[in-house]
């Protein structure tokens, strides 16, 4: 299969939405759509009284509205800082480039975001917002956990559209050749992925980290009522994401220029294994804590 010739810049008819070096790209649009849909879904969760057993929800819809800005900043700042620290600083070529042009750190429009950095940025945003609003930060994390896969799904789809983060070479019939006119134009006539079929690992991640993780977390929220069990949804997110990411690292192409880690580990594995470990501990603790009994009458949040 040949990778479809999709321009990473969004077009309306024949017009590209571009102003000099700045352009509206599918990757940026994926962030916007993911955040907006996640915001509305979080408000829906807060307003669904059945999920809270008659107790007051963790946050109000107005607080969710305010939290969106904090989370957006956490995603952008954390994602970029994480990419610089976890990848650029360990890549000899990129590290040398940063030494010559340190302000390249701020060129987010040229690409380079880390999920794990964005995850830590969102965690920081939740902690700071929870302290300001005097909300239990772990319960606030439980509210955000079922929402996160929405953004992950759109982000991985955008990775696919960009023709980046492709997988290892494969002989499977769904293997894809990540080479087309757009990619050649952006890489001085070459195709970084070569001309052999590769795993479309971006789509694997969209399916597991996006669709399947969304279904698991929302089953836990709606059927198991785990929004009432402090820390359980955060734990489920950490465990599932850690498992999915570690398993998919086997088909993702290794990051170019990164050092060789022991035991065949990749940076994605190194950053995901602690998530898995913390998630197991959190779930063990959450399942031991008693759940407040449901109230006689459901509380309908404003």
Curated annotation (Swiss-Prot):
Residue positions binding a 1,2-diacyl-sn-glycero-3-phospho-(1'-sn-glycerol): 156
Annotated localization: Cell inner membrane
Keyword Transferase in record: yes
Residues in the signal sequence: none
Transmembrane portions of the chain: 26-46, 67-87, 108-128, 231-251, 263-283
EC number: 2.5.1.145
Record function comment: Catalyzes the transfer of the diacylglyceryl group from phosphatidylglycerol to the sulfhydryl group of the N-terminal cysteine of a prolipoprotein, the first step in the formation of mature lipoproteins.
Protein name: Phosphatidylglycerol--prolipoprotein diacylglyceryl transferase
Organism (species): Caulobacter sp. (strain K31)
């Amino acid at each position: 299969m040949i990778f479809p010739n999709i321009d990473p810049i969004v077009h309306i008819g024949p017009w590209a939405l571009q102003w000099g070096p700045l352009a509206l790209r599918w990757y940026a649009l994926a962030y916007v759509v993911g955040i907006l849909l996640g915001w509305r879904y979080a408000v829906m969760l807060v307003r669904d009284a059945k999920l809270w057993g008659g107790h007051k929800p963790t946050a109000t819809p107005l607080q969710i509205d305010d939290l969106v800005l904090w989370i957006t900043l956490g995603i952008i700042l954390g994602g970029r800082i994480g990419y610089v620290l976890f990848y650029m600083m360990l890549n000899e070529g990129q590290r040398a480039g940063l030494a010559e042009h340190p302000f390249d750190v701020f060129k987010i429009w040229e690409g380079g975001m880390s999920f794990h950095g964005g995850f830590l940025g969102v965690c920081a945003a939740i902690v700071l917002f929870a302290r300001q609003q005097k909300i239990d930060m772990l319960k606030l994390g439980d509210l955000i956990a079922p929402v996160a896969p929405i953004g992950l799904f759109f982000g991985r789809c955008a990775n696919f559209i960009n023709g980046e983060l492709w997988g290892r070479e494969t002989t499977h019939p769904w293997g894809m050749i990540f080479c087309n006119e757009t990619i050649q134009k952006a890489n001085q006539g070459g195709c970084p992925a070569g001309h052999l079929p590769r795993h479309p690992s971006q789509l694997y991640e969209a399916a597991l980290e996006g669709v399947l993780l969304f279904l698991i977390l929302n089953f836990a929220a709606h059927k198991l009522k785990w929004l009432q069990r402090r820390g359980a949804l955060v734990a489920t997110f950490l465990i599932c994401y850690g498992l999915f990411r570690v398993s998919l690292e086997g088909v993702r192409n290794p990051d170019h220029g990164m050092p060789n880690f022991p035991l065949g580990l990749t940076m994605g594995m190194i950053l995901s294994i602690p998530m898995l470990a913390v998630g197991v501990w959190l779930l063990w603790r959450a399942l031991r804590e008693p759940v407040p009994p449901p109230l006689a009458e459901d509380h309908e949040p404003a």
